[in-house]
Amino acid sequence: MGSGHQIITLAGILLLSFLFLTVNKNNSERASSLYKSGSVIDANGVAQSIIDEIQCKAFDENTITKSVWSSDSLTTPNSLGPETGETQNTQFDDVDDYNNYSTVITVGNYGDFNIHTSIKYVMNMSPDNISNSQTYSKRIEVAVTNFSYPDTLKYYHVISY
């Protein structure tokens, strides 16, 4: 085999090696993208389940057994959170009990999802604006983190009385 054949053979081996490395890199990137997409889908499910759980509760501690005719009768913004003795979400009986609630939910291949909720009064006709006083609308914010994505995913839902 002459030196010309050796050079062509070597070039062919290098080209084939480059092709295999490129295909392997593309497959790895695709698998990583699929994994991240799957974890975001599961994060959506986890956040929605927390929102659904919160929506099943009374709007306010003062609306559990009676109607409220004035927003001034609702829990003050500084008092949002669980009442004395309510230490677990199974004991929560109204929406604002979930203010500053944190938990970890483990989902299959995607590991732990760290959940943090925040409840705020918002302007009735402008739910993006936080209110410093009681209103008939509360915004639920669910923040979800997971090791597979660098950012915190935030989900919002407004509930009104």
Can you say where each PLM-predicted feature lies in the sequence?
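Low-complexity, Gly/Pro-rich coil/beta segments used as flexible assembly/activation regions
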Residues: 41-161
